[in-house]
Amino acid sequence: WASQVSENRPVCKAIIQGKQFEGLVDTGADVSIIALNQWPKNWPKQKAVTGLVGIGTASEVYQSTEILHCLGPDNQESTVQPMITSIPLNLWGRDLLQQWGAEITMPAPLYSPTSQKIMTKMGYILGKGLGKNEDGIKIPVEAKINQKREGIGYPF
């Protein structure tokens, strides 16, 4: 699973105890939180000993009484004992993200700053392809080495 930072929130699906949930990837949350209205009524929960900070005022805060089996977005095996409260959407916190091997990466630019300035002056728009309709190749073409030296017209 991968998600580029955009105006859309990074959400992904997880399967907890065989039930599918969708949640927001939240690297700022220590623990995962399931929305109270999505928590199955037959799953046991207890009043939480600690409150939740950073999500506003939560009057009812519960925690699962059991450690639950979870499959991440790419079927990563994990376990979770989520908090449960009235929030609009589920939050996948670092307790799950670490088990899923989540990473935050910022790729190096494909082109040097100098070449980007030259291309911008020529009408290049970042994220668009080159060409009349800006629909050309968006990544650099890699040269392929022909180890057999075939196709150049001369037998060796």
From Swiss-Prot:
CDD domains per UniProt: HIV_retropepsin_like
Enzyme Commission (EC) number: 3.4.23.50
Recorded superkingdom: Eukaryota
PTM remark: Autoproteolytically processed at the N-terminus. Expected C-terminal autoprocessing not detected. The sequence shown is that of the processed Pro protein.
GO BP terms: proteolysis; viral translational frameshifting
Keyword Hydrolase: yes
Biological function: Retroviral proteases have roles in the processing of the primary translation products and the maturation of the viral particle. Endogenous Pro proteins may have kept, lost or modified their original function during evolution.
Family under the similarity heading: Belongs to the peptidase A2 family. HERV class-II K(HML-2) subfamily.
Name by which UniProt lists this protein: Endogenous retrovirus group K member 19 Pro protein
Organism in which the protein naturally occurs: Homo sapiens (Human)
Gene name of the encoded protein: ERVK-19
